[in-house]
Regions:
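Bacterial Sec-dependent N-terminal signal peptides
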Residues: 1-23
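Short, conserved micro-motifs enriched in small and acidic residues
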Residues: 3, 64-72, 262-266
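Beta-lactamase-like hydrolase cores
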Residues: 19-51, 56-62, 89, 136-142
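Hydrophobic (often cysteine-bearing) scaffold residues that line and stabilize catalytic clefts
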Residues: 21, 25, 66, 70, ...
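Conserved serine DD-peptidase/penicillin-binding transpeptidase domain
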Residues: 27, 32, 81-343
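Acidic/polar N-terminal loop/beta-strand segments that form early-domain functional surfaces
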Residues: 46-50, 60-61, 67-69, 95, ...
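Short active-site loop at a secondary-structure junction
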Residues: 57-77, 81
Length: 343
């Protein structure tokens, strides 16, 4: 009789606490759904205890996109098929000859799609680390004048940089960045935008980090209340020369809005061009890329130059760490393309 009483007592308390948890979950769920940020969101979840007993659900039978949870499978595949020590490579080479410090050919940068090239996340692999090694490699050969072009060979992957089903209002933002054969700074730029003093006032650009070269900007954002948060959207597309941002930003403070660079290979090329000039290395030709030549209706065949630098990415285990920790879409898309070519 004593055992039966104890069993019933346990059931009573389990039922009591389950009801209490269920009530709290319901209140929290409804509160969450009333937030402005949840205006167009979908939510579905089901809660059970360790024994599988039902506690609470909100549209528990509704199917939703699995979204970033799929990254777990991509990460597992990368470690299994490519290995934790796998590294991407970026190479710098040249064509022609060097005579008395003058290079008669082209300077070429090529890669097998390294998504970490120029990333800010890894110690020893930041933009300046790559740039310094490029300059050191060129100066070690005594080159101070380049007679040809600076070519960014991004032909390793195809010219379609994003999947066909991505929404238009995603691809201009940082999480919608495409994948090129040569990526740079995670194909992301950051705009520091100052909200006005009052609701409805215009906003102003204060600083753009990794400013996309040759891109014309249209800013139609306006100021909203102090606690409204970032409700802006950037509209641009791969290879576009126009970017448009609208929506609202909070008043009285600076907001950092991150977007996707429309043409990372050309962005890297133009940065490198300025880097060469700032280091007293003259270049007579122009900056171009494999994809840019295709856009211009010209043919491009990868040039076999003389290598002067092989630059390695962090190992795959470190790439996967940031892929999972920050859910970097660029990494996932690059890994899938890499599987298609190497596995």
């Amino acid at each position: 009789m004593k055992n039966i009483f104890c069993f019933l007592l346990v059931l009573f308390f389990q039922s009591f606490f389950s009801q209490d948890i269920s009530k709290k979950l319901d209140q929290t769920t409804k509160s969450l759904l009333n937030e402005p940020e949840m205006y167009s969101a979908n939510l579905s979840f089901y809660v059970a205890d360790e024994q599988g007993n039902f506690i609470y659900e909100y549209q528990g039978n509704k199917g939703l996109s699995t979204a970033s949870t799929q990254k777990v499978f991509t990460a597992m595949a990368a470690l299994e098929m490519l290995g934790k020590d796998f590294r991407y490579t970026t190479k710098v080479s040249y064509t022609g000859n060097i005579e008395e410090g003058r290079l008669s050919g082209d300077l070429i940068v090529s890669s097998n799609g390294d998504p970490t090239l120029g990333s800010w996340r890894y110690t020893g692999y930041k933009p300046e680390d790559f740039q310094n090694k490029v300059i050191q490699a060129i100066k070690s050969l005594g080159i101070y004048k380049i007679g040809g072009n600076l070519i960014i060979d991004d032909s390793y992957f195809d010219i379609q940089t994003i999947p066909g089903g991505w929404p238009w209002n995603d691809i201009g933002n940082y999480y919608g960045a495409g994948v090129w054969g040569v990526n740079w700074r995670e194909n992301q730029f950051d705009m520091h935008i100052s909200g006005g003093a009052n609701a409805g006032a215009s906003t102003s650009f204060k600083k753009i980090v990794n400013l996309p070269e040759q891109v014309k900007w249209v800013n139609e954002t306006h100021t909203a209340g102090k606690e409204t948060g970032d409700r802006s959207i950037i509209y641009t597309a791969p290879y576009s020369e126009v970017a448009y941002i609208n929506g609202t930003l909070p008043s009285g403070k600076m907001t950092v809005v991150s977007g996707s660079v429309p043409n990372p290979p050309m962005q890297l090329g133009l940065e490198m061009y300025n880097l060469l000039l700032n280091n007293d290395i003259e270049i007579k030709g122009k900056v171009t890329s494999a994809s840019q030549l295709l856009i211009e209706g010209k043919e491009y065949a990868p040039l076999k130059g003389k290598e002067i630098l092989v630059y390695y990415s962090p190992t795959m285990d470190k790439i996967v760490y940031w892929f999972m920790r920050k859910s970097v879409n660029l990494y996932g898309e690059t890994l899938v393309k890499t599987f298609g070519l190497l596995v």
